[in-house]
Each structure stands twice: as C-alpha cells, then as structure tokens.
C-alpha cells in the first residue's frame, strides 16, 4: 500500500537520449548508482536534480560502455 503524499515511480520521466559529455558535478560519479549518493546532474543545461532520500533508477543503454542515459526515475 503506497504511503500518502509519496509519489509513485515514473516509468519514463523523459525519453530524449542525453549524449555524453553533459554537465556533471565533479564530485558525483555517473557509475555510482548507490541511492545514498547526493545528486546526479543529467541535464545539458546544468540543471541538477536533488530529490533525497528517494532512490534514483537509471535506464542505461549499455551498462559496460555508457554513452547515453535514457531516463531517470525517482521513487
């Protein structure tokens, strides 16, 4: 049963592929998918998404050779 006031996970927040390189804070690692990580910057316009303590799920094209991020899901 979902908690009142907590949004459900979005299946596709955005579907436009983001090609590397894009703006990422130097102290944040793209390959670190730990939900405890502070934030991830996944915008060509240097917009950082900070929605703690929700977990971040990444839809990656290729986990071994990451070139695009298809989307980010905040839960």
Swiss-Prot record:
Family from the record: Belongs to the UPF0377 family.
Q: What is this protein called?
A: Putative UPF0377 protein YAL067W-A
């Amino acid at each position: 049963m979902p908690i009142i006031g907590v949004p459900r996970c979005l299946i596709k927040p955005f579907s436009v592929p983001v090609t590397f390189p894009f703006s990422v804070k130097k102290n944040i690692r793209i390959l670190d998918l730990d939900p405890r990580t502070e934030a991830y910057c996944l915008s060509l316009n240097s917009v950082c998404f900070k929605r703690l303590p929700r977990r971040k799920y990444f839809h990656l094209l290729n986990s071994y050779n990451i070139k695009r991020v298809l989307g980010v899901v905040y839960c």
